Regions:
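Histidine-centered active-site loop/cap adjacent to the catalytic His
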Residues: 14, 25, 36, 41-42, ...
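Proline-aspartate-enriched helix->loop->beta-strand connector
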Residues: 256-265
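Membrane-interface motif at the C-terminal end of an N-terminal transmembrane signal
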Residues: 32-50
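Serine-dependent acyl-ester chemistry module
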Residues: 47-122, 126, 137, 146-147, ...
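Membrane/wall-proximal cationic-aromatic binding patches
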Residues: 58-203, 207-209, 214-220, 224-227, ...
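N-terminal Sec-pathway targeting helices
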Residues: 7-30
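Short helix-loop-beta-strand segments that form the rim/entrance of peptidase-like active sites
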Residues: 224-240
Length: 519
């Protein structure tokens, strides 16, 4: 009896061992297959093999292929385009900051809350709202909020970035809270100080090692060294996302003017680009309110897409089910643009109060910026603004998904033709304004390659696109800088300046915030 029982036990153990071995072999095979599929997908999508989490999804890196077709500038070596530009020195991210960031991103994924992880590392203007708990976005802050008191008591700009910090998205800020490496407030001898202002298309994605102004600074100093010019170019980035021209004017007045720049470059043309002003009554965008919330599988796939290129492909493929066509413009209902009577589209009168896409507001703010800069003998330059849109544009529905969604959902029901028409008109107005006031005009939109692989969506660039915009802006700046250097206008004598920036004397305050139950 015992021998029989022992034999049965032995057989059972053998079967279990075989079952376990087969199971482990199956899991190992599955793991190897998934790893191979992940590696192949990363190779196909030009994603670094060992990057975790994944960088932002981009198209193919086609930037270098365009360099030879761009204008040649005397003294510029095209090989500089491929320089490895070291990122600014990073500091360790405090554990509490990382917890805040991770918790907020999870909350956003689960509930759609407006206060994202990166918003925790902004310093919010106390004049924005008397009570943050009544603010549709700030009320979702995780029990605390960084704040500052504006010097003029007004709500613009709505926020600054934390100074001298590295946030969990890896963006580095200087002593002013501007994107970039360390900077001294006082000007140095034989230095040309250039400040870029704008919104998200200038500050760029916080995950990227550099924004395009940082590339401009690198290329200018490379050029100066190659030419034997005893000048250092200090290129700074005072931009921040989600602001319009009035907010930019406030930043220039409060933050940029005290730094006594030689040149301020304005690049913005998206946040106030609203065609509704000349469209009258248009069909409304289909509501998403009735859509069912994402299920557990969709949430799992979304989380996995941060870490896996294969999961990102699956998520994107699922999203394509809602997309009509094969990358062409989606069907849209008819509407009529009501062009202002007598407005010459090819030679616009910039004094008219009925210019479309909020241009009267923008030009008024540019007037204020010019006036404020003139007080410290600083010059304003205006750049044209590039949109990735044209009539008949066909995109890759996988690689260029976010361009498609912005043009067809974000700007519904407006056609590609009308979006391109108004974007070109806006740039003609910018050029006319620059001519009228004797300002340099940098025609980035006409010079930048029209390549969707350089764009994340219709206005924001991929990282190769940031490098390309930096290179194009550099090429357009060189003739202007040569003129200023030849005339003796630059570099200027070092002005008398206080030791610290007056707008940033008081450090940010971290205040508690208890809004009770989520609303």
């Amino acid at each position: 009896m015992n021998d029989k029982w022992k034999m049965q036990q032995s057989v059972a153990k053998a079967r279990f061992s075989k079952f376990l071995g087969n199971g482990l072999l199956l899991l190992a095979s599955l793991g190897i297959s998934l790893a191979a599929a992940e590696a192949f997908t990363r190779w196909q999508d030009d994603v670094p093999l060992f990057d975790f989490p994944l960088p932002l999804p981009v198209g193919q890196d086609t930037a270098a292929s365009h360099v030879a077709s761009l204008p040649s500038v005397a003294g510029v070596n095209r090989d500089w385009f491929s320089d490895k530009v070291p990122p600014p020195p990073r500091q360790p991210v405090p554990e509490q900051w990382q917890r805040w960031y991770d918790d907020l991103e999870r909350k956003h994924a689960a509930t759609g809350s407006l206060f994202r992880g990166g918003d925790m590392f902004k310093v919010w203007n106390t004049a924005l709202t008397p009570n943050p708990c009544d603010h549709v976005m700030l009320r979702d802050a995780p029990g605390a909020l960084f704040v500052f008191d504006p010097p003029d008591g007004k709500p613009l700009p709505p926020f600054r970035f934390l100074p001298s910090a590295t946030n969990p998205e890896t963006m580095v800020t200087n002593e002013f809270g501007w994107r970039g490496g360390p900077v001294t407030f006082a000007r140095s001898p034989r230095t040309v100080r250039i400040v870029f202002v704008g919104s998200s298309t200038v500050v760029s994605s916080h995950h990227m090692p550099h924004s395009f102004p940082e590339f401009v600074g690198h290329f200018l100093n490379r050029w100066a060294k190659a030419r034997g010019i005893d000048v250092r170019f200090e290129v700074l980035n005072a931009a921040r996302e989600s602001i319009g021209s009035t907010g930019i004017a406030a930043i220039v007045r409060q933050e940029v003017v005290p730094t006594r720049p030689d040149l301020v470059i304005y690049y913005e043309g998206g946040n106030q680009f609203a065609l509704d002003s000349i469209a009258g009554s248009v069909p409304q965008r289909p509501s998403t309110a009735d859509r069912a919330p994402p299920g557990p599988l969709a949430m799992l796939l979304k989380d996995a897409a941060r870490w896996s290129a294969l999961a990102r492909r699956l998520e994107a493929s699922a999203g394509l089910l809602d997309q009509p066509g094969n990358g062409a413009e989606w069907p849209k209902p008819a509407y009529t643009l009501k062009w202002p009577a007598g407005l010459d589209e090819s030679a616009p009168d910039i004094t008219r109060a009925d210019l479309p896409v909020n241009l009267p507001v923008i030009l008024g703010d540019l007037d204020q910026i010019r006036t404020d800069l003139a007080k410290v003998d600083s010059e304003l330059a205006i750049s044209s603004f590039i949109w990735m849109v044209r009539d008949g544009l066909v995109l890759d529905p996988m690689r260029h998904r976010y361009i498609l969604e912005q043009l067809n959902v974000g700007y519904f029901p407006f056609s590609y033709r009308d979006l391109a028409r108004l974007a070109a008109f806006q740039n003609r107005v910018f050029a006319a304004y620059a001519r009228a006031h004797g300002l340099p005009f940098l025609d980035v939109a006409a010079t930048m390659p029209f390549d969707p692989n350089l764009f994340f969506d219709a206005v924001h660039k991929t990282y190769p696109g940031e490098r390309m915009q930096g290179w194009v802006t550099f090429l357009l700046l060189v003739p202007l800088i040569e003129q200023r250097l030849a005339s003796g206008a630059w570099p200027k004598p070092v002005p008398t300046m206080p030791p610290t920036h007056p707008a940033f004397v008081a450090p940010p305050r971290l205040v508690p915030l208890d809004c009770g139950k989520p609303r």
